[in-house]
């Protein structure tokens, strides 16, 4: 309905202008030195939700005077779900609910959020001018947005390409895509959108993400089909490919409807060509809403929408399913939170992971696995089976009202996994509730009976998770007891062994070897990158040559590195996960050697110690490198609870002889005050420019933190591939060229022969047909005919000594309508193009030349450990591409991770003696 223009101002518009005056008044205070930017940010955030809700009421009124009260706002917000042009308002409102109502931000957090929401204010300013001829936020430019100039230049050029008129095309034959991320950016006061997409198959990974740019915001919850044009921009004389999206439509996979229906015991076979399917997709595309939004409508609106969607359809397969879902959700039956979330995201892989063949009596008879029950009870504090929902998706699908106990627990869990802290101070969670004790009781009473270990408990002024404390206590107690007595005869035996061989390369290592098990049955070795930790492991292994040895590490690359470098007999190598999960593994061994200990979680370490029966332990790692993804601080903590003779530190690096580089590593490691000066003086820092694409060495790598974004791994790989002069072969969405460097992924097809992180180069590509392609790769591993006997691989004549040449095929994935053929291993390309790799993936690797890219977009995620890991990959040349502002922000936020605080509280609680450590 087209709104009639009115000559007078509506009361709701007057209210909007009142809010605008408050916001603009705060922006004016930016120029005052007496008012902190943090305070202004918090004030602006407080007004943002009011602004969005008032604009929603203005839209709902369609030019009519309507009362503004508590009842009107929810109706107005629901009205926004009827038209896709309001999508950005709904998204903004959802972000605000998540960040303001439930996570009261600290000063820095408020400012960061304001920067994030700046784009939405620009969208509001543009929208209200176009729709209602209202002039809002006229001094928004006073908020200082420090945009990276290089990134801004790219976006300006992309915006120019987005202004080009392109033909309308039939994109129905294009592949479906999942929308992974939608990022607004502003050029000349106009909003545009960067979107990260992945092919809509169950088996896609982060390596399959690619970026498109559009004038339109796209809803993120469902798969889409889109018109995508391949274009390029020119920067510093270099052409860089960009993908331009002009049109899209929601295109949920038919198998996702089938699998969702099966949760209710209803068997359907959705067809993409059916009137029913087309009607649903048209409605979802035009409205921008989700199927969850649909079932939450009033009876009257629901009936109208159902007629719109299914009016032209004779067969209505999914209508009964929606009716059942609506009935379950509106009556708040057991299982309703799961159905809410699944209906909101409709992701095939997630759906199938939750499903079972039998009815679950505790979940209203739905065919959902028992493991889904914790999520149904406390969705903000638990996960679905093999799926961790994003906070944004949770807030959009499930009402957080009355779930303060879950949000508090979520914060504590995040503090453990992100900051490696066993104890969370009570004062940090008081922002969720005024009565922490009562909310802890509510949480503990709601825990599923099989998850008693997740209970929250208090000690002093701290809160902790029971099983985390139990695991930590188990580790410290076991290692303490093993440190009380030495290995009888060790001192004499190791002395004789070293004298006979005369091959230990430094006095530092000789001294450590001499003392290693003299007084203890557990030895801990801390060492920086390149100090010879693996070298020392090899010597211990050779000394214990006739004894049974079990080598464990967290990742396959670390395991393979040990397998290659340990020259001893009686060895078993495996990942920690495999050791824990497998039955047929060695339990009784003479020595357990664990590498990369800083990456091992407390839960995994406790399980290993409970399973293995070993005489001695050697635990090796670097607390300054990347830590465990889940909570893991035992390796940093253990030195406070074992005698000083039981732990040692390797300090001399051997990876490089470059004195300036060695000094840089030390200054970063110890956080010296003159770190910035050293970086500048030795020209390690550079603004992001053309030189990032100019190779300094054949053995060179570019390191990025993330896969997405303009300077994410996937985009950098595409840019650098442009420099490869060989002809391109297109396969699906990706382009391959002879000469491209590659790294293998965690592909089930060739594990363990071709392991994750194995380096190689494409030396040949043969496209047999549109359905089949052959890759010929030179890999950094020597293989024989016997090695490949049980694999679908051809071994060709070698090109370079110490390497092998292999050949294998990849088949084209079938239509994404169905899921039966999705998991065929030979449809996945098992490697990624690797001109650039992630910092995490580079751990354990080394290169002559390393370039690290850090942009404003990801500066808050660069921790001290991540930065240290990145710069210590280099053997010779190092360049860090960042702006001076980003450099200052990253370095000023560095903190050395130290478990001393946790160790102090832990010692008081468990009465274990804590040892003083001299700096």
Q: Which residues does each PLM region occupy?
A:
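Core RecA-like ATPase module of SF1/SF2 helicases and allied nucleic-acid translocases
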Residues: 531, 570-573, 656-659, 694-919
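N-terminal pre-P-loop "Q-motif" helix
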Residues: 500-521
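Conserved, well-folded catalytic cores of nucleic-acid-processing
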Residues: 478-485, 543, 565-569, 611, ...
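ASCE P-loop NTPase helicase motor core
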Residues: 515-518, 522-681
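Conserved RecA-like ASCE P-loop NTPase motor core of nucleic-acid helicases/translocases
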Residues: 523-566, 620, 675-718, 728-735, ...
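Extended, solvent-exposed polar beta/coil surface segments
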Residues: 1-251
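N-terminal accessory nucleic-acid engagement/regulatory domains that precede
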Residues: 132-135, 140, 145, 150-486
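Conserved adenine-nucleotide phosphate-binding loops and their immediately adjacent elements
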Residues: 488-501
